[in-house]
């Protein structure tokens, strides 16, 4: 049975959502591993020490701020690249 354009669009949307969620999980796992490795040192007790908790929170905050800043810069460069491509297309008469 042939797929309709609507079904193809839904399949692509599902793939995009799965990719987005997969990227989120990879980022979350990287954050968890990095902060755990950097901050947790004492395995002789079940309790999390205040210093470990503070370090983990600082690590998480720094990572999230860095991720936000990289995303902002990426968006800025995308806008510039789009404007440059548009200007080039206008200059060459392809628009």
Curated annotation (Swiss-Prot):
Q: Where in the cell is it found?
A: Mitochondrion inner membrane
Key words of the record: Chaperone, Disulfide bond, Membrane, Metal-binding, Mitochondrion, Mitochondrion inner membrane, Protein transport, Translocation, Transport, Zinc
Q: How does it sit in the membrane?
A: Peripheral membrane protein
**Motif range for Twin CX3C motif?**
35-59
Q: Which Pfam families match?
A: zf-Tim10_DDP
Disulphide bonds annotated for this chain are: 35-59, 39-55
Family named by the database record:
Belongs to the small Tim family.
**What quaternary arrangement does the UniProt entry report?**
Heterohexamer; composed of 3 copies of Tim9 and 3 copies of Tim10, named soluble 70 kDa complex. The complex associates with the Tim22 component of the TIM22 complex. Interacts with multi-pass transmembrane proteins in transit.
Per the entry's comment, what about the domains?
A: The twin CX3C motif contains 4 conserved Cys residues that form 2 disulfide bonds in the mitochondrial intermembrane space. However, during the transit of Tim9 from cytoplasm into mitochondrion, the Cys residues probably coordinate zinc, thereby preventing folding and allowing its transfer across mitochondrial outer membrane.
- Name of the protein in question: Mitochondrial import inner membrane translocase subunit Tim9
Originating gene: Tim9a
